[in-house]
A protein has these predicted regions:
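Helix-to-loop junction immediately C-terminal to a conserved catalytic motif
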Residues: 51
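Conserved ABC transporter NBD signature motif
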Residues: 59-67, 105
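Conserved ABC ATPase "signature" region
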Residues: 67, 112-127
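ABC ATPase NBD coupling module
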Residues: 68-85, 221-226
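Conserved ABC ATPase signature
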Residues: 131-141
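A short, proline-enriched helix->beta-strand linker immediately N-terminal to the Walker B motif
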Residues: 150-154
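Catalytic Walker B motif of ABC-type/P-loop ATPase nucleotide-binding domains
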Residues: 156-159
Length: 229
């Protein structure tokens, strides 16, 4: 579970102070949560604060049973290694390593040994000896998903994971994420500007100008292949 209580976050540039998160409180019980909002609404900053990549100016954040807002930088780094994983719009694969070694690197960082299973789970077993430059964009993103899940995280954070992909490839990547989330039971929190993806989520959080404007639950989430794009 993830819980935030009265979170504020601002950035300072010279004499200019910009409030990005304004008194955010929320609970995410599990399943797939989608955070929606226009550019500049604060959704990516919220993801960073919930995951421990950044600290709030004030307020409390609990993620995977630990109060990360009270941790030192070193403790938060250790928390991220142990408990959470990330998938971004950019793949951040090491070009000199094969698919297999890129995924193994994620597993090794967390002391896990299930990297081979994750390569099969994202249907890249036949390409495990290939290098990132030999893969399509969708395949590279699947490698980044496998690398993240090879850590066996309690929470997977995704920031615009299909932003650089075409519709067909994007749907397939989202389908992988949803299927693996259901099979493995981790919590997934995804930031996206694609409002149609609200239909596939268990929980939807809408943001506007640094505040939560709406939160609701879907009783029967749809397949990504049943919605618009």
């Amino acid at each position: 579970m993830i819980r935030a209580e009265h979170i504020f976050k601002s950035y300072t540039n010279g004499k200019t102070v910009t409030e990005v998160l304004k008194d955010i409180s929320l609970e995410i019980e599990g399943g797939l949560c989608v955070i929606l909002g226009a550019s500049g609404s604060g959704k990516s900053t919220l993801l960073s604060v919930l995951s421990g990549l950044e600290t709030p100016d004030s307020g409390k954040v609990v993620c995977a049973g630990e109060e990360i807002s009270a941790m030192t930088d070193k403790a938060r780094t250790d928390f991220r290694r142990r408990k959470v994983a990330f998938v971004f719009q950019q793949y951040f694969l090491l070009p000199h390593l094969t698919v297999e070694k890129n995924v193994k690197l994620g597993a090794d960082l967390a002391g896990n040994k299930n990297y081979a299973e994750m390569i099969e789970a994202v249907e890249l077993g036949d390409k495990k000896k290939k290098f990132p430059t030999e893969l399509s964009g969708g395949e590279q993103q699947r490698v980044s998903i496998a690398r993240a899940l090879a850590k066996n995280p309690e929470v997977l954070f995704l920031d615009e994971p299909t932003g650089a992909l075409d519709e067909k490839t994007g749907r397939k990547v989202i389908d992988f994420i949803c299927r693996l989330q259901r099979e493995r039971g981790f919590t997934a929190v995804m930031v996206t500007h694609n409002t149609n993806l609200a239909e596939i989520a268990d929980t939807v959080i809408k943001m506007n100008s640094g505040k939560i404007s709406e939160v609701y639950q879907n009783q029967t989430p749809k397949s990504v292949f049943e919605i618009g794009w």
